[in-house]
Amino acid sequence: MLSCRLQCALAALSIVLALGCVTGAPSDPRLRQFLQKSLAAAAGKQELAKYFLAELLSEPNQTENDALEPEDLSQAAEQDEMRLELQRSANSNPAMAPRERKAGCKNFFWKTFTSC
């Protein structure tokens, strides 16, 4: 019984001493500087990673353009021209106002069709 009490007392004493040493330890300014530098380096690494990712994403476009033959370039130019023409034609004729519609067109209005 005495040995059990002694073991419990020694265990409690060691825990109290360990906690006292940890809380009473002076803070090291070098440790704080090291942590701040490591946090700053991590932020720099994220920016660097974003930069390299942007470079990697732009590289396949460059290699594809270099690998294109003159025939492919002419086809690509034709496709671009067709796309521009479609955009121009879509933008040149805006949607007509309801009053400018042709006579005889029908709109759905409250359960019935009405002519314009």
UniProtKB/Swiss-Prot annotation:
The keyword Ribosomal protein does not apply. It is found in: Secreted. GO terms for biological process: cell surface receptor signaling pathway; cell-cell signaling; chemical synaptic transmission; digestion; G protein-coupled receptor signaling pathway; hormone-mediated apoptotic signaling pathway; hyperosmotic response; negative regulation of cell population proliferation. The modification Alanine amide is found at A43. InterPro entries: Somatostatin (IPR004250), Somatostatin/Cortistatin_C (IPR018142). Residues 62-82 are annotated as: Disordered. Residues 1-24 form the signal peptide. Its main location: secreted. Disulfide bonds join C105-C116. C-terminal amidation of the neuronostatin peptide is required for its biological activity, including for the regulation of mean arterial pressure. Residues 25-88 form a propeptide. It comes from the Eukaryota. Keywords: Amidation, Cleavage on pair of basic residues, Disulfide bond, Hormone, Pharmaceutical, Secreted, Signal. GO terms for cellular component: cytosol; extracellular region; extracellular space; GABA-ergic synapse; neuronal cell body; neuronal dense core vesicle. Belongs to the somatostatin family. This is Somatostatin. It comes from Homo sapiens. The lineage of its organism: Eukaryota, Metazoa, Chordata, Craniata, Vertebrata. The gene is SST.
